Curated annotation (Swiss-Prot):
Organism: Kunzea baxteri (Scarlet kunzea)
Chief location of this protein within or outside the cell: plastid
Coiled coil: none
Function: Usually encoded in the trnK tRNA gene intron. Probably assists in splicing its own and other chloroplast group II introns.
Protein name: Maturase K
Entry-linked Pfam families: Intron_maturas2, MatK_N
Compartment(s) of residence: Plastid, Chloroplast
Length: 503
């Protein structure tokens, strides 16, 4: 990585980066996969012992420019071994290289802007669970929420124009545009092709999508500061996660050139809160639905006139928080009213006082989670555990370690659930699926294999939180009930579990 950064430092004096030559450096693809140069996960199923080298990249670029993707047919793909059978494989290599190369100048520019403006990094924002602590603190005092799916560009050139601000190298942009045009049909063809494109090119797609989302989020801190004239509590989050200060002067010019200052009075709301993960965001407010409708109209006009994205206003619903649940990051979150009756007596008069308190609840939706287990072949459609024949060739320790790791990761991620009974069912499915896989490997019945393993095997499926807490606190009934059933937000989770990502 030092060599990569040193290469970019050589060209910083010219105020742009020459990224095109980096496509022919082998260490770029080693960085992309976190593997050595002699081994790559891309070629596990390949018939030949190929390596990601500059020769392969040169061949791919040459064939891409020679072929016309608009007249490329299925018959040609069968006849052309390189651009047919190996097209997806080589394109996956190139997409990984693109992702690493294009990410680097943006990261360096962001770090340079932090050093210049002396903005301190907020390391506590790296955990996904910090979002739920924010929701617990803020959403219990709010009344209305809009849960919105972010629209995506309908034309590729709009996305390419967005990238021109970040990447100044014309050669890299031209090749990237050509590469995207070759695969753009995957977005307008059936769903299976889209799924293949996303799975085959995850890093490049995430970078392109996040660059698209950042264009929306630039505007929110600026609008909030301009409209409410109060210090924005969320500006520090945006300043770290996106590059707000880089484009603030540009957006000031855009808004005042287009007479946007005349509608800023609609948005004077110091209680507006915004949170986003992946392709969904929620906007919540304490005021009346009238203000939420004004925000709704503004967002639709912003997407249509400034980002050329068509979006139907009817798809943005305004709901009361006390009557609505938000499906967010593998949780079903809601604000519930808990009533508590207090008995008060003064002299001979007896009064009952009913106190209503808001509580932020996070529940694990068991049906989608079991659906994820079904897709991963841990159970059938009814939730009954099944064995995994593909794992029978592994050793017993590897099979047990894999199931334990999945079980602990799921339990660790969903430790903030206010109702953990559904997690016990997930543990049961994973535990019995592990036993059935081992019994199938040794050609024995499940009953005899469980007797052979004993109760010690079942105790291994305790979560890490239960093991640590059992060593610190006594296992009394009151302590166990308070600790194991309470919400535990772990601030070391940087990515959502694959099984929990069923949205």
């Amino acid at each position: 990585m030092e060599e990569f950064q040193g290469y970019l430092e050589l060209d910083r004096s010219r105020x742009h980066y020459l990224l095109y030559p980096l496509l022919f450096r082998e260490y770029i693809y080693a960085l992309a996969h976190d593997h050595g140069l002699n081994r790559s996960m891309l070629f596990e199923n390949a018939x030949d012992d190929x390596k990601s080298s500059s020769i392969i990249v040169k061949r791919l670029i040459t064939r891409m420019y020679q072929q016309n993707p608009l007249i490329f047919s299925a018959k040609d793909s069968i006849q052309n071994q390189f651009f047919g059978h190996n097209k997806n494989l080589y394109s996956q290599i190139l997409s990984e290289g693109f992702a690493v190369i294009v990410e680097x100048p943006i990261s360096l520019r962001f770090l340079f802007s932090l050093e210049r403006k002396e903005i301190a990094k907020s390391y506590n924002l790296r955990s996904i669970h910090s979002i739920f602590s924010f929701l617990e603190d803020k959403f219990t005092h709010l009344d209305y929420v809009s849960d919105v799916l972010i629209p995506y560009h309908i034309h590729l050139e709009i996305l390419x124009q967005t990238l021109r601000y970040w990447v100044k190298d014309a050669s890299s942009l031209h090749l990237l545009r050509f590469f995207l045009h070759d695969y753009w049909n995957s977005f307008i063809t059936p769903k299976k092709h889209i799924t293949f494109f996303l799975k085959g090119n995850p890093r490049l797609f995430l970078f392109l999508y996040n660059s698209h989302i950042c264009e929306y989020e630039y505007i929110f801190p600026f609008l909030r500061n301009q409209s409410s004239h109060l210090r924005s509590t969320s500006s520090g989050i945006f300043x770290e996660r996106i590059y707000f200060y880089v484009k603030i002067e540009h957006f000031v010019k855009v808004f005042f050139d287009n007479n946007f200052q005349c509608i800023l009075w609609f948005l004077k709301d110091p209680f507006m809160h915004y949170v986003r993960y992946q392709a969904k965001f929620x906007v919540a407010s304490k005021d009346t639905p009238l203000l939420m409708n004004k925000w709704k109209c503004y967002l639709v006009n912003l997407w249509q006139y400034h980002f050329s994205v068509w979006f139907q206003p009817g798809r943005i619903d305004i709901n009361q928080l006390c009557k609505y649940s938000i499906y967010f990051l593998g949780y079903r979150s809601s604000v519930r009213l808990n009533s508590s009756v207090v008995r008060s007596q003064m002299l001979e008069n007896l009064x009952l006082i009913n106190n209503a308190m808001k509580k932020f609840e996070t529940i694990v939706p068991i049906i989608p989670l079991i659906g994820s287990l079904y897709k991963s072949n841990f159970c059938n459609t009814f939730g009954h555990p099944i064995s995994q024949p593909t794992r029978t060739h592994s050793s017993d320790s590897d099979i047990i370690d894999r199931f334990l790791r999945i079980c602990r990761n799921l339990s660790h991620y969903h430790s903030g659930s206010s109702k953990k009974k559904s997690l016990y069912r997930v543990k049961y499915i994973l535990r019995l699926s592990c036993v059935k896989t081992l019994a199938r490997k040794h050609k024995r019945t499940v009953r005899t294999f469980v007797k052979r393993l004993g109760s010690e095997f079942l105790e291994e499926f305790l979560t890490e939180e239960e093991v640590v807490l059992s060593l610190i606190f006594p296992r009394t009934y009151s302590t166990s009930r308070r600790l194991y059933r309470g919400q535990i937000w772990x601030l070391d989770i940087t990515s959502i579990n694959d099984l929990a990502n069923y949205e």
